[in-house]
Amino acid sequence: MKAFHTFCVVLLVFGSVSEAKFDDFEDEEDIVEYDDNDFAEFEDVMEDSVTESPQRVITTEDDEDETTVELEGQDENQEGDFEDADTQEGDTESEPYDDEEFEGYEDKPDTSSSKNKDPITIVDVPAHLQNSWESYYLEILMVTGLLAYIMNYIIGKNKNSRLAQAWFNTHRELLESNFTLVGDDGTNKEATSTGKLNQENEHIYNLWCSGRVCCEGMLIQLRFLKRQDLLNVLARMMRPVSDQVQIKVTMNDEDMDTYVFAVGTRKALVRLQKEMQDLSEFCSDKPKSGAKYGLPDSLAILSEMGEVTDGMMDTKMVHFLTHYADKIESVHFSDQSSGPKIMQEEGQPLKLPDTKRTLLFTFNVPGSGNTYPKDMEALLPLMNMVIYSIDKAKKFRLNREGKQKADKNRARVEENFLKLTHVQRQEAAQSRREEKKRAEKERIMNEEDPEKQRRLEEAALRREQKKLEKKQMKMKQIKVKAM
């Protein structure tokens, strides 16, 4: 009976407390305004009521009854707590959604769920990032090309050096027997014979010889192919060319007469006629065949006068030209040699270029590029031809008619040149006069003494009046002559 009485008291207390709590939630607006702190206070009240009820039950006398009542009270309190929690969840779900309260909440991605849901994918490594030889094919090609270029440079340079030394060894005895000095490099003030070639670069070698009668000196230039250049080697596979030996002999003015003459391949003569100043002015006709003198069809002749051709084409010269026609590119004798034509952007030069009496020879080395040191021996007879041409040019002289014709040709060329440059020379003279006047005016203006400045101005005015009077006198004389 006591236990039942205690149970009724607990129910009354719990009902009164819950009824007092739910009175605050009669209006829906109150529920919306209720925040988390209010619910925390509500939970504190529930805990206080639960703790007070068992304290009141402990005062009973029967231990067993007290234990039973206490357990039943705890079970009922737990059931009441669950019912209150369900009631609160239902009330919060029925509340209206406030956008301002949860602003920015939906924008935040759920990183934890996405990390767990994303599947693990294995990415294939690109081919160019794989650690294999195929990934370095470009580097391999570059290194291979660089090594090929270096090897070709070394081999080509050494071959040109061997060819040059082979040529010099073959011709050294002949050169030393005809010239006192062989191989002067020009580094010393006094001419000294070094007895070796002077290397200009990897494919050009020079040799200067002097100390012979009727000539100032002879410059020999060995112009080999650019074997050290890999690109040039590849280009020569499609268009073969030959090594060349160019010889320039500078004659003394008194040891060579006035004439222009050339013999060589037709292609070479056409090119020289366009490029060389003397051939374009004194040999304006097309190259003529040398069949009349027994020359092969591959060779042609350019000459200022027929007398020069007859004098130069003697038996020994024809012998050289006929037997070594495949090695001869051109032979050019001229007293008006000034080199290639001068191309100026602002027009013709104001004076004729300086000329020298020279003999020019261009020989092709046998082999068409595939040259060996032993092929240099085939050029030795051509050096004998050069020595013979020096003596031949010294002995040959024009007759009176030929000399007069040569002088007329040179006067004609000079006159044509002066006509072409007349306007330019007038402009140059006018600019010099204006510059002189400007300098005179500046000198007068810079004078500080007024009296001296006045005298200078009067002197300049008198000079101008005298020049004007001279011009008027010349005009009167011209009118009188015309009458």
From Swiss-Prot:
Basic and acidic residues biased stretches: 105-118, 430-472
Keywords: Coiled coil, Endoplasmic reticulum, Glycoprotein, Membrane, Signal, Transmembrane, Transmembrane helix
Topology in membrane: Single-pass type I membrane protein
UniProt GO cellular component terms: endoplasmic reticulum membrane; multi-pass translocon complex; rough endoplasmic reticulum membrane
Record's protein name: PAT complex subunit CCDC47
Function, as annotated: Component of the multi-pass translocon (MPT) complex that mediates insertion of multi-pass membrane proteins into the lipid bilayer of membranes. The MPT complex takes over after the SEC61 complex: following membrane insertion of the first few transmembrane segments of proteins by the SEC61 complex, the MPT complex occludes the lateral gate of the SEC61 complex to promote insertion of subsequent transmembrane regions.
Main location: endoplasmic reticulum
Transmembrane spans: 136-155
Superkingdom of the source species: Eukaryota
